[in-house]
């Protein structure tokens, strides 16, 4: 039996499907992307228009045997763009079915710089070509280039061959870098410098891992193998993790100075495994089910897959053996974008125990049916997620320090009319007695970080404290697994201190809001 992963709520797992055999050419389909069996090439189906500039889900993308392994295909202004580096606007996108091409206009308003990227099907490959009607602006010469990014987790440890020279993608970020004067740094988001140069007035610039005109990526892994060649431009391979933990491997060609017309051309040929069909993706409750509730699994299928008429429920017995306890028919739900969906109702399974779903040769991981499955679902959030986000506190867990006491030096008054990155802004008036950039005493108390980083969103803190208060008023959760000492500015996870945790969380947020 094969084990298939669960379908997590809120996650959109993209995958590939195509024709009937490995000899099929890439075609431009009615959904306006190129496809063959096992390969999809998307051309600005997703644009650089999110709230965080470079969100690793834009530009030219490749979905390769069920995994989006490549993205970010665009004219960019640095070797390994970071989150707050400038991204191009895409004022137009033209799909030409007759020519089997998609053309996207790109523009950097800050530099009055326009380009066009044209992707055209050529057999099992696509040509990616960059066109310029005007030469690269002088201030961007040597910086403007065409980039394509590769997901590190899918390639590290795998081989690549550049112009016949064998090499391997590194597991860790270990390539070479240089530093350059800040005066040579291309402008970042809204003109801000989003890196810390430690007073050196220099920025870090990664050097390429390899350079050549032809690269075969992952020849040792057919599901990830891609051949890329260029007759007119050097291909330079970089490791974007040298500058950002969420950086990807980057293949890049510099746009030549002083030229117009077609200035860069790549031939990109992703390998396709013969008769590949994406495995079924079986969705069910990860929490489990109470005996009396409806129980319906949703099974997501490759459009080339043939739905099975039945699925089964197996129970895991006390001795570790398994037994089929229910078999029922599946029912068609319909198509949604790339996939076909069927449903499997097993509501009549009510006996408490450990179970899994079997669909054809695929089995899921386990789930539990019991009256108490919802009793502890908030414990991980309450015991770990919330306290590790406490600002202005040293947070410890056993032998691990999550973070020291942040922002001990306090905060400065933002200048009027300041539009900072990450949603922070100051209007034309400060409405305080403090001058621009003057230290404001007493602000470095309480509060919680924004999810995933170390800033504070006051609006979010207000919303969360309201939810905490509502939870306390309705349910009075008495769980106490967190030690909080305001005096010591110290938090220790999994250590009771005699006070319900939720009351301490309310106090943290209220203290912060009152100080503001």
Predicted features and spans:
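Beta-strand-rich recognition/accessory modules
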Residues: 200-275
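Polysaccharide-binding surfaces and accessory modules of carbohydrate-active proteins
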Residues: 22-33, 131-222
């Amino acid at each position: 039996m094969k084990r298939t992963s669960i379908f997590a709520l809120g996650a959109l797992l993209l995958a590939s499907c195509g024709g009937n055999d490995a000899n099929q050419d890439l075609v431009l389909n009615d959904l306006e992307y190129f496809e063959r069996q096992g390969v999809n090439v998307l051309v600005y189906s997703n644009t650089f228009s999110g709230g965080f500039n470079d969100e690793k889900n834009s530009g030219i993308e490749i979905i390769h045997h069920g995994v989006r392994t490549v993205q970010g295909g665009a004219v960019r202004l640095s070797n390994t763009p970071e989150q707050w580096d400038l991204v191009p606007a895409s004022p137009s996108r033209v799909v030409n079915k007759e020519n089997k091409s998609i053309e996207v206009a790109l523009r950097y308003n800050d530099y009055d710089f326009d380009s066009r990227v044209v992707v055209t099907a050529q057999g099992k490959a696509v040509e990616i070509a960059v066109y310029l009607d005007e030469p690269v602006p002088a201030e961007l010469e040597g910086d403007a280039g065409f980039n394509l990014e590769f997901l590190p987790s899918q390639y590290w440890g795998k081989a690549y061959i550049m112009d016949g020279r064998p090499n391997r993608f590194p597991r860790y970020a270990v390539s070479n870098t240089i530093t350059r004067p800040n005066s040579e740094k291309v402008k970042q988001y809204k003109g801000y410098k989003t890196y810390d140069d430690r007073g050196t007035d220099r920025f870090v610039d990664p050097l390429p891992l390899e350079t050549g005109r032809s690269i075969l990526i992952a020849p040792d892994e057919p599901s990830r193998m891609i051949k890329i060649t260029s007759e007119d431009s050097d291909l330079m391979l970089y490791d974007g993790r040298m500058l950002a933990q969420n950086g990807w491997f980057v293949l890049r060609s510099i746009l030549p100075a002083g030229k117009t017309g077609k200035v860069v051309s790549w031939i990109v040929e992703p390998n396709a495994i013969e008769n590949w069909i994406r495995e079924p993706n079986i969705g069910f409750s990860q929490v489990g089910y109470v005996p009396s509730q409806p129980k319906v699994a949703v099974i997501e299928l490759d459009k080339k897959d043939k739905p099975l008429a039945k699925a089964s429920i197996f129970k895991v017995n006390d001795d570790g053996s398994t037994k089929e306890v229910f078999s029922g028919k599946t029912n068609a739900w319909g198509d949604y974008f790339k996939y076909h969906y069927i449903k499997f109702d097993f509501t009549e399974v009510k006996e408490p125990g450990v179970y899994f779903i079997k669909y054809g040769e695929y089995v899921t991981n386990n789930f539990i049916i019991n009256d108490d499955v919802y009793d502890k679902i908030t414990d991980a959030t309450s015991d770990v997620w919330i306290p590790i986000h406490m600002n202005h506190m040293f947070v410890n867990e056993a032998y691990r320090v999550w973070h020291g006491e942040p922002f001990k030096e306090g905060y400065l008054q933002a200048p009027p009319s300041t539009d900072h990155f990450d949603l922070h802004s100051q209007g034309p008036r400060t409405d305080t007695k403090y001058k621009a950039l003057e230290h404001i005493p007493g602000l470095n108390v309480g509060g919680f970080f924004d999810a995933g980083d170390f800033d504070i969103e006051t609006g979010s803190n207000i919303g969360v404290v309201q939810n905490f208060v509502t939870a306390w008023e309705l349910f009075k959760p008495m769980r106490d697994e967190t030690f909080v000492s305001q005096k010591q500015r110290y938090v220790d996870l999994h250590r009771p201190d005699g006070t319900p945790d939720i009351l301490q969380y309310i106090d943290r947020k209220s203290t912060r809001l009152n100080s503001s």
